[in-house]
């Protein structure tokens, strides 16, 4: 039976045409330590235009680029480790680089408390970036979990979980 299954997989893989394929790019942590925040500071704002310049081509060429947003967008004061809060301009640079989906359930998702988590989701929604992992309330979780995206005729389901939140309490319902 194993041999038949393997033959099926080989046949199926070889019979796919270009329109039957999708390229998915997964990247690790998108985060901002204090030195990165300080380096991006320009006048009254932050400039991340060059942040992804060496990898933007690869990110934007993928049919779907997915990254782990390992910071909150909790507003000022902006800080790096241990309680991350990145400037909004960082999220704009992530979108401009070509990321389609950000995963938000990780050990830093509550670094700025519930308000920081909610603001992060609000910012993602305002830029129309798909996201999975954290939710403002049980209703939002029920509506958006699991994240289902249709792309190039494919249905992709993304699940995102975390092992913990660095000792910060979570609302188990959301």
Q: Model-found features: residue ranges?
A:
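Sec-dependent N-terminal signal peptides
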Residues: 4-14
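Acidic, metal/ion-coordinating pockets
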Residues: 18-174
């Amino acid at each position: 039976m194993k041999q038949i299954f393997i033959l099926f997989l080989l046949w199926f893989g070889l019979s796919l045409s270009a329109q039957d394929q999708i390229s998915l790019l997964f990247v690790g942590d998108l985060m901002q330590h204090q030195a990165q925040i300080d380096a991006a500071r320009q006048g009254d704002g932050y400039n991340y235009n060059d942040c992804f310049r060496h990898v933007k081509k690869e990110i934007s060429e993928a049919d779907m680029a997915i990254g782990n947003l390992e910071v909150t967008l909790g507003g000022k004061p902006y800080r790096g480790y241990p309680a991350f809060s990145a400037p909004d301009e960082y999220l704009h640079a992530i979108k401009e680089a070509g990321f389609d989906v950000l995963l938000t359930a990780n050990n830093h998702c509550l670094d700025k408390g519930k308000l920081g988590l909610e603001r992060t989701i609000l910012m993602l929604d305002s830029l129309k970036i798909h996201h999975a992992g954290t939710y403002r309330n049980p209703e939002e979780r029920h509506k958006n979990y699991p994240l289902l995206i249709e792309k190039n005729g494919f249905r992709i389901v993304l699940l995102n979980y975390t092992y913990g939140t660095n000792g910060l309490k979570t609302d188990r319902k959301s």
